[in-house]
């Protein structure tokens, strides 16, 4: 009886204490929220236009508006940002937490937040976190209440972790994977990320346009759903922040977009930003490695991994982590490899993103890019002064010449450990080519404009590890800009929505091998004829696209994964079998095969993998392809010869990305499939007559 009483008193006291603590926290964060004031104007498409007197006010409003439309993906990110995937997914999630903790991401943020993050940026980040917390207070029954309160460190961690995927640590691991049977904990974080399928940014100036305008189409390809899907918003303050464009859940800054003076977009590039070093271990002491002739102690730490075992039962596992002077150490097949990669201790990405958001000229934007905390991406820029620019942004290590850095490096010599980046002026960039056009589509940085304006690759060190791949989108861009001697608004959009494959592309060359093959069945001979007559388009009425895209997809997926594709004959036979089983024939209309699904409805859509109208589909339960990545939010911005701006955009779904009860859940789908745009209502006068709702937060 006494034990029961003690248990009851303990539980009662604990519950009372928790409730008291929760109320104190709520009161504290409500008081914090009341220090901000933001005006949210929803346009007729539901897109939020946020205004605040200060940048911090605007960031607070942005966080609240985004949470209204998509709190789920913002909150889901916090499992990863806090290295708590183990508490969500058990052992598989703990493996992801291990890598984040080995890389000391949260540790560095907590240690260096006040010194590394600029004060004006801290104010914005802290206001953004306060906006999320205010939404959570207003919606206390949400299923992610365990993340309350969100902190500024959570926000910075998101930027650092995203930088991780592009920094090269995963490339280092992939290099080792080709040599050894690598442990799961070193690859699971990479394999659990959505595939980023590429991007397009096209820019033209008065040297190419028929009306002396300057134009840019920003067309980043992301997953259409999830934590890396685009959200459209407009942020404006009286402190000079006036950006509209795309951002990810949990971001207070626009990643791709425009203001009244400039616009930019990014595409993924793949410079070699990482290295793996093979260490020599002391045979008498496994905790020492050889460096410059001397045995050197590893730095050793214990990593704690809280993990869900079953239901509410949790357990904290402990793992050892080793570090050399090169970086974190992986033990693989009785060998020790140290990793070194660009940005490995940098948490300043937020400073650079904010500087870009506040830029208003070419020089200001370039100054932001010179910060080098964003370690990769191709940047394409345009402005009202008729400037266009291509930048192969790369925080490339300053490496010793004469060494093949694609291979594993000798870890016993300290002179092979690089400690700085090549100068900004030494990375590829083109400003105002005489051709008047730039097309960045994840390709060779020396083939982004007319041949007479392209850079000479021989002027760049091989230690930069610059990519040489060409995409179909790159070939088609070059062909189309060559075909159209002058470009106007409609022609520029025609190029953007082109849905054909080039005969120069890897995809076509892969398929063409099938043309000369001999088959012994009527079914395969008929399918071969269908493939031969394909005009390489992916328009809705095309009857060869289903077979063609099916076959070439194997090559494209293999290239993305840096694998050798299977024999095209095997792909061909597999596709004939798949299409026949699904449609009863190998030549269904592309409109019967390729869809975008939303709100229980499927709508046919043109485009396909690696065409400029990029649609990356996944098979659904019926065997059809449903768009999962590619064209999402895209934006067309222009300035006429007088500097007057026009802008239009479209989102694959609508602004209310998670609210199925809202008309804005899917109200842009039809425009999307019709390859049309909506106005952005960026100008105050346009927004004033196209407003659906105005409200203030806090109320």
How should each PLM-predicted stretch be described?
Residues 16-17:
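C-terminal motif of bacterial Sec signal peptides marking the signal peptidase cleavage site
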Residues 526-533:
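A structural micro-motif at secondary-structure boundaries
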Residues 20-509, 513, 517-520, 533-699:
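C-terminal/peripheral segments of proteins
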Residues 2-9:
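Sec-dependent signal peptide recognition
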